[in-house]
Amino acid sequence: MTFALGQRWISDTESDLGLGTVVAMDARTVTLMFAASEENRVYARNDAPVTRVTFNVGDVIDCQEGWSLKVEEVLEDEGLYTYFGTREDTQETAVVLREIFLSNQIRFNKPQDKLYAGQIDRMDNFVLRYRALTNQFEQHKSPMRGLCGMRAGLIPHQLYIAHEVGRRHAPRVLLADEVGLGKTIEAGMIIHQQVLSGRAERILIVVPETLQHQWLVEMMRRFNLHFSIFDEERCIEAFADAENPFDTQQYVLCSLDFLRKSRKRFEQALEGEWDLLVVDEAHHLEWSQDKPSREYQVVEGLAERTPGVLLLTATPEQLGRESHFARLRLLDPDRFYDYEAFVEEEEQYAPVADAITSLFSGEKLPDEAKNQITELLSEQDVEPLFRIIESNSDEEAKASARQELIDNLMDRHGTGRVLFRNTRAAIKGFPTRNVHLMPMDIPQQYTTSMRVAGMIGGKMSSEARAMKNLYPEEIFQEFEGDDASWWQFDSRVNWLLEKVKEKRGEKILVIASRASTALQLEQALREREGIRATVFHEGMSILERDKAAAYFAQEEGGAQVLICSEIGSEGRNFQFANQLVMFDLPFNPDLLEQRIGRLDRIGQNRDIDIHVPYLKGTSQAILARWFDEGLNAFAETCPTGRAVYDKYSDALIEILASGDTSTLDEIIEESAKLNKELKSQLEQGRDRLLEMHSNGGEKAQQIVEKIESTDGDTNLVTFALSLFDTIGLNQDDKGENALVVTPSEHMMVPSYPGLPYEGATITFDRDTALSREDMHFISWEHPMIQGGIDLLMSEGVGTSAVSLLKNKALPVGTILLELIYAVDAQAPKRSGITRFLPKTPIRLMMDSRGNDLSAQVEFEGFNRQLSPVNRHLGSKLVTSVQKDVHRLIEAGDVLVEEKVEAVRKQAQQDMQQSLNTELERLQALKAVNPNIRDEEIEAIEAQIKELTGYINQAQVQLDSLRLIVVSHN
């Protein structure tokens, strides 16, 4: 390297310093001053990591005074360059610019500039960049985008609802699946799709206070969506950053109570300009025509101002008709304006349901059914379809004709677009429940303490006394003090220890009402038998609960028993276990259902054993009988339980408080009778039509198959590992399909997106991720992959490379130039541009004559024949063929235009076809189904117009290039 004072060089390792000037030299070192960043660097002369900056004829260069020069001639004198040419601003000719006056800010951002400046990247980085571009393009175009990356089993009805609703513009929908069918996951999938497609940027979730953490965890664990819980404290903190605290976060989660109690916070939430509002447990919003509750008004206010609304609620039958109408009114007040009209309309659906039932049966259609269908579809000619169904055509043609009729009828079915509801009856795949009720002798110690408590507790209300009597161990402890070890003599504990030993290989979930009971049970198992157990209660942080859940889930060396308190277990699911022990019983059938629902969920592969040990002659024994004989609530899900409970709870409280069981048999008998009546009403009122629509039938199955085919994509694994390598993350193989990824000191950026400071355990396997909550499930949609790709693009990794091709058939020194262009439409994400024209890579492979060989030379196969070169040799090769490279880039720029035009044309065609089909369908439906909102139609019309403009203006630029030189050795 020969240096001279005043020469301009650029640092290879710190390109952001700008252009440096040689300001001092001695025999061993050279000093460069980087004026743009006000830094000096001293390098050893013989191997300084710097590259000489030289420009060629045709380049445009900037002067320190702010004007630019188009170079026409370059002279070198004593190691310094002088450039001659024309000023760009004044068009003055024969202007002289000495290199000392070059702008210090010059950065080599264009790939060709980096190549000429010797800033040559590693060959594998170039390959990684190209793969990132192509994979990202394919992901954006996929119709399953937003559904593949969630940590959840592939359950057809959930995926169907999410796919159906998630693609709509500002969906307004009621999700009313029965318990255990996964409404939260459906809502999460819809949110995830809306976020990825850019349709929703600001989201507000309103839930009952007890469910806040569950939602926070579910959104983070399953969908990598990080919500912030807002309460009064958080709002006061946020006030420092913004007038309206809700403006400080994009994804907000808060309780309904919080908005109800404070008018100020409610008004601030109203001004939050949300794109999507999600309300869980919406059946608790009470409404009547003359007097809506305050909670209802809060949600109504938010729903009026928010374009997209998801309401999650119990099934409509549990709600009753009026209450169900009130939910629909929140979604579309113009359409559901009058309760009487709604009732009348509902009654008209009976013939539609009958018609569909006869189509589904696959048998010959009776004339009556045909007349009904013809009448219902009066605006279309259905005769040809009837003919196909009755002809001797193949089964497939018949099935598709039936399906077409069904689809058309479904579309006309009033609430089909607004309401989705699945029942266990309509969905297969639930386990059987085996119930074991075990009466046990009551220890003497309890009898004494309960008798004494009965004498002193005269002033308590019946309800308080009934609650207290449910937990004899707490009464005993009150008398004996906190050190009292009731678990040394409690017969339920003795039974539990035996049970756990008997089921050595099985995971057992124990649920108790109180956190204190759960903690003491763990102590009993540990101290009396050395059994590995872990606890889960509301006093623990989310992270601690996760660790406990992961310890329980571990196959080897994990806990055999997990003991949960009532609140601690809310919203957590342990499908991998099938043994449930209820150490005590909750007072309310909904809570009982929730306990069983921890194991009895869609996705449970085995039958469930439910063990209920209870002490004879206590309140627990009374409750156990009522749940079992009155409601059959242990053996079956009990959608009617709440209604029966509301009717008989006062009588039950009296019995539990006084211990007088003389009326118990009568209450059990009446409860069972009422329960039976309510259940048969439910069965008759089952809206089969709605069920057919909600579970998606064949379509749902196809979605599952499509996603299954992308699971376990080896392409993703290879890509992710090279991405982590390039960015500088440490990777340790953990076995069991798992890797541990941690930040290193040599990372390209100080913190990696989506990766916690302490690192993370990741897996690419869906089943592993489902059984291990502490692992991240990596898919193309995961922030670690998306963020990594964004990093590659923004940091300019792999934009220029040089490779050698060893091929004796070609003369030594032959060059090829691989050019990667990217077509990009500058448009806001919410416009939906990425569906039709995401960033699209176009690859050209130029030979030395300027022909494009990309059609004959496939990327991956060709890449395997190339070998990398070091930066020094690469720089020399570039310098020797720089003029040829210039010429080939110019030829490439001309050739690529034709391909860009084809890309634009294809995007326009896809967009017009997709959106016009949807538009025509909605317009046709509008005539017969008032559930189509005008806004939906207007939104699509506006979107078509907007996208046409964006696609026409899409630009192309050179993203990266690779020079390939033929050698023989």
From Swiss-Prot:
Domain of life: Bacteria
Coiled-coil intervals: none
SUPFAM superfamilies, per the entry: P-loop containing nucleoside triphosphate hydrolases (SSF52540)
Domain Helicase ATP-binding: 164-334
Residue ranges crossing the lipid bilayer per the database entry: none
Motif DEAH box, residue numbers: 280-283
GO molecular function, one term: DNA binding
Ranges of residues in domain Helicase C-terminal: 492-686
GO BP annotation list: regulation of DNA-templated transcription
Binding positions for ATP per the UniProt entry: D177, E178, V179, G180, L181, G182, K183, T184
Pfam families for this protein: Helicase_C, RapA_C, SNF2-rel_dom, Tudor_1_RapA, Tudor_RapA
Alphabetical keyword list: Activator, ATP-binding, DNA-binding, Helicase, Hydrolase, Nucleotide-binding, Transcription, Transcription regulation
EC number: 3.6.4.-
Complexes and interactors: Interacts with the RNAP. Has a higher affinity for the core RNAP than for the holoenzyme. Its ATPase activity is stimulated by binding to RNAP.
Function text: Transcription regulator that activates transcription by stimulating RNA polymerase (RNAP) recycling in case of stress conditions such as supercoiled DNA or high salt concentrations. Probably acts by releasing the RNAP, when it is trapped or immobilized on tightly supercoiled DNA. Does not activate transcription on linear DNA. Probably not involved in DNA repair.
Similarity remark: Belongs to the SNF2/RAD54 helicase family. RapA subfamily.
Stated name of the protein: RNA polymerase-associated protein RapA
